[in-house]
Amino acid sequence: MQSELQRGFVLHRRPYSETSLLVDLFTEESGRLTVIAKGARAKRSSWKSVLQPFTPLLLRWTGKSTLKTLTKAEPAAITLPLQQIALYSGFYVNELLTRVIESETPNPALFQHYLKCLTGLATETNIEPTLRLFEFQLLQILGYGVDFLHCAGSGEPVDFSMTYRYREEKGFIASLVKDNLTFYGRDLLAFEALDFSDDAVRQAAKRFTRIALKPYLGDKPLKSRELFTQNILLLK
């Protein structure tokens, strides 16, 4: 039985039986796991307001199977105030973690990246650099090794002004072809430095992470992306 409280966040929650919840958690020391929160849907349950996304929590659970039983959950701090686009971006980040990281695999570094990402979403006016940085950090932790500094075909250093075409599992090859897989050398150098201060670089980074994350996500569309699109259309 786990004795120490762990820091963590709710990634997703869904009904389980008449009064309980199944909750996907991301914790600092145990990684991602799923717990049953018994009675959390009951009218008088204090967990109903506690088990919310973007609230830093202190958690305890028990159980040896892949499905644990939550025994304690209390706020460690106030809920991070994500609103409008930042809120949907937070749902997107949560869905990424739910879909691509293995269950019960400790990753304290990723937890810190996630915490900084949520803080950035809550405080920054322009959230795009925060999102791109987290996506690249996630790819690094997943073991996605791409050389942004050298041409995969020749081994020559990437030239700032040249264009390069991405080839899965190989890297970037100098190319005059211009399509969705083509990137400028200046973009690749910025990717390596994790520098997303330039708008054109951010657009290129967004395009690249969609390509790079696809093998991990498969063909199933992201629900958070669909929800964001639907709500943007409603606001127009």
Curated annotation (Swiss-Prot):
GO cellular component, one term: bacterial nucleoid
SUPFAM superfamilies xrefs: ArfGap/RecO-like zinc finger, Nucleic acid-binding proteins
Keywords: DNA damage, DNA recombination, DNA repair
InterPro entries: ARFGAP/RecO, DNA_rep/recomb_RecO_N, NA-bd_OB-fold, RecO, RecO_C
Example GO BP: double-strand break repair
A Pfam family reported for this protein in Swiss-Prot or TrEMBL: RecO_N
NCBIfam families for the chain: reco
Function: Involved in DNA repair and RecF pathway recombination.
Sequence similarity: Belongs to the RecO family.
HAMAP family assigned to the protein according to its UniProt record, in alphabetical order: RecO
Stated name of the protein: DNA repair protein RecO
